[in-house]
Each structure stands twice: as C-alpha cells, then as structure tokens.
C-alpha cells in the first residue's frame, strides 16, 4: 500500500492567504512538500507531471507576492496548474484529477475563483490577461494581472499579437515567460540574479516611466531620442531584447527554482511596474523527481506510475492504436510516392508523424504550435504539386478554420487532413474532445469528408487520400486502440462517396459514420433477436454522401438511425437534408440521428461518455425501440 507523503507545512496552507503568513525561509520546505503531494497524486490518477513539477517555486512565489484571487493569475495551456490547485483550496480533491466527477486537469472558471480564465489550448494567456488588465484600468482598480506562459506556447502567433497590442496600449500586465527548455537563454548565476533585481527596482523602472512622461509632455519629436537614452541605460544592465522592442520592460533570465531570485524580482515588479513587464524565468521540467528530470519527454503526460521506480502502468493493447495505424500507412504510402510530405503543429509523437520523420526527415515538418500556419503552409505545398498530410487533432484543427476555408477549400487545393482524437477523448474533457470537425468541414463545397470505422478502413483512407488530387480531403479517427480486425498488406483506394453494407436486414437500418460501427453491429444482434431484422451500413463519407445507399436504406426499411461520434449538425444533418430534398421523409420513414449531446461533456472514460450520449450498443437499441413505439424488453440490449 502506498503511503501518503508527510507534509506538515503544507497541511497549514489551505489557501494563498495562509501561504502569505509563512516566512520566506519556510518556502523551500513548502516547495518540497507540494512536489511530494503532486507526485503522489499524479501517480494515482495519471496526468501532466513534468510541467507542474517545474513551476512549484514559481507558483508559490506568485501566490506569496500577489493578492490572488483579487490579482488575476492566468496559466497558459494549464498543464502546469497542479501546484496552483493544491495551494488554492483543492488539495482535498487533487486525487480526483481528470477522473469522472473530479477536478479538471486544466484551469476552469467554474471550479475556483482562483482560476480567472480557463485554458487547455495553447497561447491564449497573454490575450486574456491583456483584456483583464485593460478592464482593471477602466474600472480604476489597482488589480494586477499575471500571465504565465511557456516557451513552447510562445511559438504561436497569437502570443505575439497579444504582446504587440499590450505594448501599444502600455497596459499594466505582467507576463512571466517560463523557459523550461533553456531555449532562449540560460541564467548566469549570481550576476544574473543581481542584474534582474537591479532592472526590476525603482531606479531603472522609474527612469523608463520618466522617459514616457517626457515623451508625452515634449511631443513625438523627442520620442526617438528619449527611447534611445532609456535603451542605452537598460543595455548596461540586461541588454536589449525583442520584448523591449514590443514595448515590454524585460527582466531576466532568472532562476525559477530559487526563491532568493524570484521573490525580490516579483516584489519589485509588484511595487514599481506601471506598464507591461515580461519576466524571463528559467525552470526545469520534472524538477525534484529524478525519473522526470532524466526523461522529460516521457513524463510530460503520464499514466499511473510507481513513485519509487517511476515505472508507468501500461495496459497491453488488444490491437494497434489508430494513431500508429495511420503513421505506418503514411510511411508505406510515402515509400511509393515521393511527393507525400507530413506536417504537424508541435505534435510529432501525438500524431504519429515522428515515424515519418525517422524514415523521411526532409519530408516531415514540425511547424510549432501554429495550426494556422500549418494549414496554409500545406496549401502552398499542394499548390506546387506536393501531397501534404496536415495531421492535427480535431480540437486543434478548430484553430485554423479560416485557413481551411480561405486558403485550401476555396482554391480547391488537395491538402490531406488526417484528423486524430476525433470524438470523445476521456480525461481531457470538453476542451480536447473532437466534436465539431465533421460539422464544420462538411459545410464546405468541394471538401471530401471521411471517417474510419476500424483500423483497416483507416489504412484504406490513407491510401485514398494519397491518391486523391481533385481537392481537399479529410479522414477522422479516434484516440485509442482499434477493434482488432485483420489488416490488409496495403490500403485500397476507395471510390469517393460510396459506403458499404456490412450486414443485411429488412426492418431497421443503422447507418454508422466512423467507429460507432462496432456498437451498431452489436446492437443489430440484439435487434435481430427481438424480431427486428437489421441492416448495418458503414457510410465512410459524410461528403459526398452515398445517395444510392441512403435511398436504398430509406426505401426498404421502416426505421433509419444515423450514428456518429460528432456534434449536432454533422453527418446526420447531411443525411436529413438529403432525405428531405428527395422527398424520402414523406412516406412515414422513422428516422433518428444519434450524435454527441449538445452540451460540454465533462471528463470520464470514453466508453462512459458514449453510453451517456446513447451512442453505445444499449443506446442504439433503445433508440430503435422508441422510434417504433415499443417498450424495451429487459436484457434485450445485451
């Protein structure tokens, strides 16, 4: 049995107000105890470990110096928010992290007043923080706003748009750049700490503000001269940076694991800053836990693990994951076609494109957290005759919708979109669910929209996409493992807009789009047993629809049910539109569309989410019985 860590000091800290009562000399011990608590909690639930371990001292220092929740603290993405949750009244629930009915793995406004802005997608914190800082100025309050953003998230254009706007507005915004990959510049010991304290002190910050006041008083003619004077003085202390060019007062880099470095700088900024300030803090992912320090990439997101050894619990899969099937199929197709290239937005491992990178390093591109750029970059490649596969999670494709419409679809460019994590994703909840891709892609003229029913179908769709050059094409597939069917040596090229009948019946028709096919077949067994001979069809395409297949199903069955793991407005709506336009609803056809519910579905296991949505075997059977006006016999649904 695993024992709970001993945390005598942390036991006294329920909220940041308790933390502020501690002496500075007590904070290193508190940091050790927070780390122990976090490691133990995540070992039981799984979650994002490395990022949170890297910001323990920083989180404690911020809550110690600033008056949260009155002062607003925003974490970008949210992977690093676990220490924050422990210190803000949620320690008693930290072992429910990412579990059904438990607390979120990200910041959530509905969860705590200490979470002023929700996060899960990258690079939003500075924009949100700027909005809050401007609101504080308009309200004439002295409320401070702190945005903590990692160096990875700073690769997205949105972060720079916000920095540029904040500098132009001269907003009272504090941005803390958490450089946990040493990717910008390392701190240089005692001298770096001294210079950071000096630069954040009253004298130098006052000189900067004096320069701004003189500019306002004397006019724009002297603006350039005063700016040069301020930069000259600052250059002796820290040197100029691009952040200074954008209007930010830049401090650092400083050691993000040293309270002796963090506290003086944060207090100076709290007491003296008037305009936008950027503090560059260098941290180490996984700090304080040896296995995570040694392999940061393996401890970013973890399963349950043994605290002593660091060994993660891994369930042996019954079938290959959809991601790995896609990756292997793409590598296979790339060996036959040297025009195939892969594009990922900072997710090479998550999308499986790391396999393509290993085999064809010059034909695989990681563009950083920049989905908008990724899509238009792919469009440029397609315009020159290449076959780009822009592999994105469904939830992140949302960030690039204008580029999909304007740069790809309107021009009819043959960009291929492998859409991973389609449907429910489990512990990451509504922010990462792949709900909307079918809906927003199937509305676009000339777009081919597919969904794989199983891993063999996915292999067919990779080859089909590689062969299709008439316009944009997408294929969606879920997180997790396949159903364990026999795999073809190589995928087949599917006929565009043609589905297939998998099982023939006569009274009920189940038309599945995507991986709900397995549950549809299981439901058909129960319906057959109840005297309702059931046809099961795999649509394959939401656009173009298989009109002949839909006419056949509608004309020869009493009940037609569409099933998809997607939002309202998707495949089922496309089918309904066609049926209505063809007059196929005029003769008493009973049609029902099963989709993800029109709510934000909270975290749970995917199978629980599908059951709640009525997308599982039992839910499909129940929908058929209701459509027929019959009572469901107990046990009829398996």
From Swiss-Prot:
Q: What GO MF terms are annotated?
A: 1-deoxy-D-xylulose-5-phosphate synthase activity; magnesium ion binding; thiamine pyrophosphate binding
Query: What are the names of the required cofactors?
Result: Mg(2+); thiamine diphosphate
Q: What class of enzyme is it?
A: transferase
Cite the binding residues for Mg(2+).
151, 180
Which family does this protein fall into? Belongs to the transketolase family. DXPS subfamily.
The answer on whether this UniProt entry bears the keyword Transferase reads yes
Q: In which pathway does it act?
A: Metabolic intermediate biosynthesis; 1-deoxy-D-xylulose 5-phosphate biosynthesis; 1-deoxy-D-xylulose 5-phosphate from D-glyceraldehyde 3-phosphate and pyruvate: step 1/1
Lineage of producing organism: Bacteria, Pseudomonadati, Pseudomonadota, Alphaproteobacteria, Hyphomicrobiales
Which species? Rhizobium rhizogenes (strain K84 / ATCC BAA-868) (Agrobacterium radiobacter)
From the UniProt record, list the reaction(s) this protein catalyses: D-glyceraldehyde 3-phosphate + pyruvate + H(+) = 1-deoxy-D-xylulose 5-phosphate + CO2
Protein name per the record: 1-deoxy-D-xylulose-5-phosphate synthase
């Amino acid at each position: 049995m695993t024992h709970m860590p001993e945390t005598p000091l942390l036991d006294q800290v329920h909220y940041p107000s308790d933390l502020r009562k501690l002496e500075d000399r007590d904070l290193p011990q508190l940091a050790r105890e927070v780390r122990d608590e976090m490691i133990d909690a995540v070992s039981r639930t799984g979650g994002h470990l490395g990022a949170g371990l890297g910001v323990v001292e920083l989180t404690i220092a911020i809550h110690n110096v600033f008056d949260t929740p009155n002062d607003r603290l925003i974490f970008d993405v949210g992977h690093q928010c676990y220490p924050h949750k422990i210190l803000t009244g949620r320690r008693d629930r930290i072992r429910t992290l990412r579990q059904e009915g438990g607390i979120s793995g990200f910041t959530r406004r509905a969860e705590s007043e200490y979470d002023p802005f929700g996060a899960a997608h990258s690079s939003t914190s500075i924009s949100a923080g700027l909005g809050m800082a401007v609101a504080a100025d308009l309200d004439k309050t002295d409320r401070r706003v702190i945005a903590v953003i990692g160096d990875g998230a700073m690769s997205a254009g949105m972060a720079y748009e916000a920095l540029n706007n904040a500098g132009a507005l001269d907003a009272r915004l504090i941005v803390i750049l958490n450089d946990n990959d040493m990717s910008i510049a390392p701190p240089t010991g005692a001298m770096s700490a001294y210079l950071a304290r000096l630069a954040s002190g009253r004298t130098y910050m006052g000189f900067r503000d004096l320069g701004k006041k003189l500019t306002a008083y004397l006019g724009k003619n002297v603006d350039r001269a005063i700016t040069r004077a301020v930069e000259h003085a600052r250059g002796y202390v820290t040197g100029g940076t691009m952040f200074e060019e954008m209007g930010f007062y830049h401090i650092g880099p400083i050691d993000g694991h040293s309270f002796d470095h963090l506290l003086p700088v944060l207090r100076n900024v709290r007491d003296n800053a008037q305009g936008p300030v950027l503090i560059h803090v260098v941290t180490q992912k996984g700090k304080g836990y040896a296995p995570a320090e040694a392999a940061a990439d393996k401890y970013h997101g973890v399963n349950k693990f043994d605290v002593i050894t660091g060994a993660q619990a891994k369930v042996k899969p019954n079938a290959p994951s959809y991601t790995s099937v896609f990756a292997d199929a793409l590598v296979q197709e790339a060996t036959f076609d040297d025009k195939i290239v892969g594009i990922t937005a900072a997710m090479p491992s998550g999308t499986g494109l790391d396999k393509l990178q290993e085999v064809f390093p010059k034909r695989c591109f990681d563009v950083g957290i920049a989905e908008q750029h990724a899509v238009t970059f792919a469009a440029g490649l397609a315009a020159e005759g290449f076959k780009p596969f822009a592999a994105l999670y469904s939830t992140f494709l949302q960030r690039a919708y204008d580029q999909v419409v304007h740069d790809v679809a309107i021009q009819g460019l043959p960009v291929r979109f492998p859409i991973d994590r389609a449907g429910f994703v489990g512990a990451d909840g509504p922010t990462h669910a792949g709900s909307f891709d079918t809906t927003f892609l199937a509305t676009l003229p000339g777009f081919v929209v597919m969904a794989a029913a199983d891993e063999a179908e996915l292999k067919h769709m990779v080859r089909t996409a590689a062969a299709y050059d008439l316009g944009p094409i997408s294929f969606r597939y879920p997180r997790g493992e396949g159903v364990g069917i026999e795999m073809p040596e190589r995928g087949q090229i599917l006929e565009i807009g043609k589905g297939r009948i998998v099982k023939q019946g006569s009274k009920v028709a189940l038309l599945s789009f995507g991986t709900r096919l397995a549950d549809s077949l299981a439901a058909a067994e129960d319906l057959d047993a109840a005297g309702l001979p059931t046809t099961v069809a795999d649509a394959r395409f939401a656009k173009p629809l298989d009109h002949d297949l839909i006419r056949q199903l509608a004309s020869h069955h009493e009940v037609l049910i569409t099933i998809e793991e997607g939002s309202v407005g998707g495949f089922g709506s496309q089918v309904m539109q066609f049926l209505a336009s063809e007059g196929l609803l005029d003769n008493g056809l009973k049609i029902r569309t099963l989709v993800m519910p029109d709510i934000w579905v909270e975290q749970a296991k995917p199978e629980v989410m599908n059951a709640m949505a009525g997308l599982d075997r039992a839910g499909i059977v129940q929908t058929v019985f209701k459509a027929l006006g019959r009572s469901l016999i107990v046990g009829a649904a398996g």
